[in-house]
C-alpha cells in the first residue's frame, strides 16, 4: 500500500494524522496520506511568499520557459508512473489516461511556455500640451501567491492547466488536490525538484476540502484563487476570495446540451454523443447530459445510441479493451443512483441501464454503474435540470430550430453545447445563439488550447487558455514617461 506526504518548500512533509484512499475499481484501500495540518497550510503559504520574493523573482521569462520544458520532459520521462497513479486514483481506463490525461498534463507546460514567449507589452505615444509628448507602456508582473484547487475527474490535466500558466507568469502556487485523487500532484513534486524549480514555488497540501481547503482559501497570504469543481463549492470560494478583494477564476458545473438535426451525419453524431455522455464514466464537466434530436430521426438516434451504450466494456483499468471505468467513490455512486431513481419516479422511459452492473468478483467492490439513457421526461424533471456527473443522458425530440435553441438554453448553466448538422449556415447560426462558453459543431472535446475556455451563467467566471490564462495570472502596470 502506498503512503504519500504533502510537498512544502521543496520537501515531502509528514503529519500526525492520516487519511485513506480507496480504489474506485475495486473498493480496496490502496493508499494512506498524511493529512496536512492547519499550521502546515500556513507554512506552505509562507514558503510560497518567500520564493515569490526570493530566487524565483530573479528568473527571466526565458529561464521560466526552460524550467517549464524541463517539467514537461520530466512528466514524459515518468509517463508510466503518472499513468499508474492516475488510474489507481480514478479507476479510469489506461486507454483513456494514456491518450488524454498524461499527455495533456505534460503538454500544458509546453503550451504555456510557448505562449509566454510570445506575449508582448503594449506601448503608445501620446501628444502633450508642450509638444514633447509622452510614452505609455505596460509591464506584466506576477500576481503573487496562487491557491490552486483541483477536481478529481481529470486530476493531472486540470491541475497542470492552472499551474503551468501560473508558473509561466512568475507566480508561486499552493495546490490542494481533491482528497479522492492526490497521487499525481505529489508525484509532480518529485518532477519539480528534478527540473530545478526553486523551493517554495510549487507546494501541495493534502486533506479534505472543509479542513485544509478552507484554511487555504481563507489565508490572507493568497493573492488569487483558481478552482475547478462544483458550482456550490465555487460560490463558497468566490465569497472567501472577496475578503481582501482577491481575484478568483472559477470553472464550475454544467448541464450541457447537444442538438442533433435530421441532416446530420448520423454515424458522427452517435459516436460524438456516446463519447460526450459516457467518457470517463460521465464525470466530465463538458459531458452531454441532455440531447435534443429532430423528430424525423429521433427513434433511429435513440436506438443507435442505446446499442452504443450497451456495447461499452466495463472492466479493469489496465485491460486494453476497457472503455468505461467506475465512478470515483461510493458516495458519488449513491448520489448518481438517486438521480437514476428520480428519473423513474418522474416517469422516465429507461432506454437502457439504470442500475449497478454485475462485475467479476475482483471488481465487485468497486463503484460501478450502468451507462443510462432516458426519454419521455418534461424539461422540469430533476434529471433534466440538475447536473448529475454520471454516465447518463436524456433525449428529447424537437420540431423546429427555434424550439431546439430554446430548450438547450433553458438551464442556469452555460458551460458547453454541441450542434450536429451538415448545413454549415445553420451550424454557425445556431452555435452563435448558444448561451455557453464553448459550442462544438460536429465534434466534441476538440479545442485549440490558445482559445478561451470557461462558462457562462452559473458555470463559472473568467477564461482559461492561451493569453487568457496569462491575463488572470498577471498584474499589469502602466508606465507613463514624459518625454
Regions found by a protein language model. Give the residues of each.
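Conserved C-terminal structural/oligomerization subdomain of aldehyde/semialdehyde dehydrogenase
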Residues: 26-32, 222, 313, 340, ...
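Structural signal for hydrophobic packing residues in well-ordered secondary-structure cores
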Residues: 52, 56, 72-79, 83, ...
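ALDH superfamily catalytic-core signature
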Residues: 224, 232-378, 441
Amino acid at each position: 500500500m502506498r503512503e504519500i506526504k504533502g510537498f512544502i518548500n521543496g520537501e515531502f512533509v509528514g503529519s500526525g494524522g492520516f487519511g485513506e484512499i480507496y480504489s474506485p475499481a475495486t473498493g480496496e484501500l490502496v493508499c494512506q496520506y498524511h493529512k496536512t495540518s492547519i499550521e502546515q497550510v500556513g507554512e506552505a503559504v509562507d514558503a510560497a511568499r518567500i520564493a515569490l520574493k526570493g530566487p524565483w523573482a530573479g528568473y527571466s521569462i526565458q529561464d521560466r520557459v526552460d524550467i517549464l520544458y524541463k517539467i514537461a520532459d520530466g512528466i514524459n520521462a515518468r509517463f508510466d508512473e503518472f499513468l499508474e497513479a492516475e488510474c489507481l486514483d480514478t479507476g479510469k481506463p489506461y486507454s483513456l489516461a494514456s491518450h488524454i490525461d498524461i499527455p495533456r498534463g505534460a503538454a500544458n507546460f509546453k503550451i504555456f511556455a510557448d505562449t509566454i514567449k510570445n506575449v508582448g507589452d503594449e506601448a503608445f505615444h501620446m501628444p502633450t500640451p508642450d509638444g514633447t509628448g509622452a510614452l505609455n507602456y505596460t509591464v506584466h508582473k506576477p500576481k503573487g501567491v496562487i491557491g490552486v484547487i483541483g477536481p478529481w475527474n481529470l486530476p493531472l490535466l486540470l491541475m497542470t492547466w492552472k499551474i503551468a500558466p501560473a508558473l509561466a507568469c512568475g507566480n508561486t502556487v499552493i495546490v490542494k488536490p481533491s482528497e479522492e485523487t492526490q497521487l499525481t500532484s505529489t508525484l509532480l513534486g518529485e518532477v519539480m525538484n528534478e527540473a530545478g524549480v526553486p523551493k517554495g514555488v510549487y507546494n501541495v497540501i493534502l486533506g479534505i476540502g472543509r479542513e485544509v481547503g478552507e484554511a487555504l482559501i481563507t489565508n490572507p497570504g493568497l493573492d488569487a484563487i483558481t478552482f475547478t469543481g462544483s458550482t456550490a463549492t465555487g460560490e463558497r470560494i468566490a465569497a472567501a476570495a472577496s475578503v481582501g478583494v482577491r481575484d478568483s477564476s472559477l470553472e464550475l458545473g454544467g448541464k450541457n446540451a447537444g442538438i442533433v438535426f435530421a441532416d446530420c451525419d448520423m454515424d458522427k453524431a452517435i459516436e460524438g454523443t456516446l463519447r460526450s455522455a459516457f467518457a470517463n464514466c460521465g464525470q466530465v464537466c463538458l459531458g452531454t447530459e441532455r440531447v435534443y434530436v429532430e423528430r424525423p430521426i429521433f427513434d433511429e438516434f435513440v436506438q443507435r445510441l442505446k446499442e452504443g451504450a450497451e456495447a461499452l466494456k466495463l472492466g479493469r483499468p489496465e485491460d486494453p479493451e476497457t472503455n468505461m471505468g467506475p465512478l470515483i467513490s461510493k458516495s458519488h455512486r449513491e448520489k448518481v443512483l438517486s438521480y437514476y431513481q428520480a428519473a423513474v419516479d418522474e416517469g422516465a422511459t429507461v432506454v437502457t441501464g439504470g442500475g449497478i452492473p454485475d462485475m467479476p468478483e475482483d471488481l465487485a467492490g468497486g463503484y460501478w454503474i450502468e451507462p443510462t439513457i432516458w426519454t419521455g421526461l418534461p424539461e422540469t424533471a430533476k434529471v433534466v435540470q440538475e447536473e448529475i456527473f454520471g454516465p447518463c443522458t436524456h433525449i428529447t425530440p424537437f420540431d423546429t430550430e427555434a424550439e431546439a435553441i430554446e430548450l438547450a438554453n433553458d438551464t442556469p448553466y452555460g458551460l458547453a453545447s454541441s450542434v450536429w448538422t451538415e448545413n454549415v449556415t445553420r451550424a454557425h447560426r445556431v452555435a452563435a445563439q448558444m448561451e455557453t462558453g464553448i459550442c462544438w459543431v460536429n465534434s466534441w472535446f476538440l479545442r485549440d488550447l490558445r482559445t478561451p475556455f470557461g462558462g457562462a451563467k452559473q458555470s463559472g467566471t473568467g477564461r482559461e487558455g492561451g493569453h487568457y490564462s496569462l491575463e488572470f495570472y498577471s498584474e499589469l502596470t502602466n508606465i507613463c514617461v514624459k518625454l
